[in-house]
């Protein structure tokens, strides 16, 4: 099973000296507009996917899951709509905390 270490870095030089350049970058990519049900009724929202880019090799992988918005309950017990962008950014933060990606859930884009 292949994994990617999100904390992997390459030592590089610039005019200010040496520094570590992160190899992998996670990003949310906007997709299609779809109809969604919000707490105020029907509306529209974008779908999102998550991609991981390697700036040194040019490789791009995309998570096999399309992220859509949904209605969630907050800490106060109130219901509200969470956009697909917010959900994608939350997932990216969780991935960064773990620091590794299991590549069985990702496909090669480029």
From Swiss-Prot:
It holds the Pfam family Phage_30_8. This is Uncharacterized 12.9 kDa protein in Gp30-rIII intergenic region. The gene is y12M. InterPro entries: Phage_T4_Gp30.8.
């Amino acid at each position: 099973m292949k994994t990617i270490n999100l904390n992997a870095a390459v030592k590089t030089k610039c005019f200010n000296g040496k520094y570590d350049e992160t190899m992998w970058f996670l990003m949310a990519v906007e997709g299609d507009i779809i109809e969604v049900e919000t707490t105020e009724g029907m509306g529209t929202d974008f779908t999102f996917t998550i991609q991981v880019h390697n700036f040194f090799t040019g490789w791009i992988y995309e998570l096999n899951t399309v992220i859509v918005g949904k209605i969630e309950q907050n800490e106060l017990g109130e219901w509200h709509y969470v956009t697909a962008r917010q959900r994608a950014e939350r997932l990216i933060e969780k991935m960064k905390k773990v620091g590794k990606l299991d590549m069985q859930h990702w496909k090669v884009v480029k």
